[in-house]
Curated annotation (Swiss-Prot):
InterPro entries: ZC3H15/TMA46_C, Znf_CCCH, Znf_CCCH_sf. The gene is Zc3h15. Residues 13-29, 64-74 have a biased composition (Basic and acidic residues). Residues 61-86, 218-285 form a coiled coil. The modification Phosphoserine is found at residues 231, 351, 360, 381. Belongs to the ZC3H15/TMA46 family. This is Zinc finger CCCH domain-containing protein 15. The keyword NADP does not apply. It is found in: Cytoplasm; Nucleus. Residues 236-260 are annotated as: Required for interaction with DRG1. Keywords: Coiled coil, Cytoplasm, Metal-binding, Nucleus, Phosphoprotein, Repeat, Zinc, Zinc-finger. Interacts with DRG1; the interaction forms a polysomal DRG1-DFRP1/ZC3H15 complex which provides protein stability to DRG1 possibly by blocking poly-ubiquitination. Associates with microtubules.
Length: 426
């Protein structure tokens, strides 16, 4: 007799599965109904450990994915076999009194019906979808309303929805012209729809749920403002044309006089601020002052600090290993900082006619202006001026007339003295 087969050590698969479930139930006793994250995490870890042992979670997920792929491959293989060999289709049976034309032919589905128009069953494959039973628990209109969102609406559609949704409720409310802010926020944020409910009380909200005539949404206002913005070039041209012809030409003398005046104004302002802060400090009003201001307001503190300071002196020693790096020092040449007049040869100046004829926005005109050529607004190039002879003499350019008596001899002397005594620290 052949030897008996040895019994499996672990028993059948069902027995092993029952053992694992029993172990999981014992270890997680009283924790299944707990909703805490820690308890659920512990239950998941215990289940994974009992079922798969010490396997890596990635390996487990990979094995499950492989099983799923095998099932899909089997289904595809079965479908291919059915298409190739076309298994025998059982004869159709219908209940008494039923119309055969309301049932799709099973042989026609498999492509095996040879009766054609004589077949008593229907050959319309869309018949099943048309005759599908409607569930008494589902309203098809709800699905249509869910798909009909505010993103696809225009103004007319929005008014129609508002009237249908809030029309009857608006009639029962007390008369008020104030629009509900929740309603406006929902429309502005594209949250309004068929299922929107007012947080201020639903249909019992006392404010209006309708847009007043002519109301413009904020998002539409932003679009209009962006369209009304002008370019930087147009803004510069408008501001330049608004100056007019009666302006002072900027020369070296006028610029230096303006600079001197501004510097003096700055010094006067600083002195006034210092006097005011000093008065506040003496009166005890200044709460926040710097250490420098304290010694400026009370110079006697400097001597007190010197008397109380330590008499220890520190001498900086030089080690023998240190190398004396001789660095060349150059004196400052003040002549390099003397302002000089800019050479005006080759500089194009716009004529006074530009204020009467506004420059066109054509690209060709802008290109000619940038290159210094002929333009419609009255600008002239150096070649035209040289050929005409009337616009430029000896490198000087005709522009706005300058008052020669603007600076007297005394002003020029003061200016020269200031340049000679120029302090570089300023």
């Amino acid at each position: 007799m052949p030897p008996k087969k040895q019994a499996q050590a672990g028993g059948s698969k069902k027995a092993e599965q029952k053992k694992k479930e029993k172990i999981i139930e014992d270890k997680t006793f009283g924790l299944k109904n707990k909703k805490g994250a820690k308890q659920q995490k512990f239950i998941k870890a215990v289940t994974h450990q009992v079922k798969f042992g010490q396997q890596n979670p990635r390996q487990v997920a990979q094995s499950e994915a492989e099983k799923k792929l095998k099932k899909d491959d089997k289904k595809k293989e079965l479908q291919e076999l059915n298409e190739l060999f076309k298994p025998v289709v059982a004869a159709q049976k219908i209940s008494k009194g039923a119309d055969p034309k309301s049932v799709v032919c099973a042989f026609f589905k498999q492509g095996q019906c040879t009766k054609g128009d004589k077949c008593k069953f229907s050959h319309d494959l869309t018949l099943e979808r048309k005759c599908e039973k409607r569930s008494v628990y589902i309203d098809a209109r709800d699905e249509e309303l869910e798909k009909d969102t505010m993103d696809n609406w225009d103004e007319k559609k929005l008014e129609e929805v508002v009237n249908k949704k809030h029309g009857e409720a608006e009639k029962k409310k007390p008369k008020t012209q104030i629009v509900c802010r929740h309603f406006l926020e929902a429309i502005e944020n594209n949250k309004y729809g068929w299922f929107w409910v007012c947080p201020g009380g639903g249909d019992n909200c006392m404010y209006r749920h309708a847009l007043p005539p002519g109301f413009v949404l904020k998002k539409d206002k932003k679009k209009e403002e962006k369209e009304d913005e002008i370019s930087l070039e147009d803004l510069i041209e408008r501001e330049r044309s608004a100056l007019g012809p009666n302006v002072t030409k900027i020369t070296l003398e006028s610029f230096l006089a303006w600079k001197k005046r501004k510097r003096q104004e700055k010094i006067d302002k600083l002195e006034q601020d210092m006097e005011r802060r000093k008065a506040d400090f003496k009166a005890g009003k200044a709460l926040v002052i710097s250490g420098r201001e304290v010694f400026e307001f009370r110079p006697e503190l400097v001597n007190d600090d010197d008397e109380e300071a330590d008499d220890t002196r520190y001498i900086q020693g030089t080690g023998g290993d240190e190398v004396d790096d001789s660095v060349g020092v150059n004196d400052i040449d003040l002549s390099l900082y003397v302002p000089r007049d800019v050479e005006e040869t080759g500089i194009t100046v716009a004529s006074l006619e530009r204020f009467s004829t506004y420059a066109s926005d054509k690209d060709e005109n802008k290109l000619s202006e940038a290159s210094g050529g002929l333009a419609e607004n009255g600008e002239r190039s150096d070649l035209d001026e040289d050929s005409g002879g009337g616009g430029q003499e000896n490198g000087s350019i005709d522009a706005v007339p300058v008052d020669e008596n603007l600076f007297t001899g005394e002003d020029l002397d003061e200016l020269e003295e200031e340049l000679n005594t120029l302090d570089l620290e300023e």
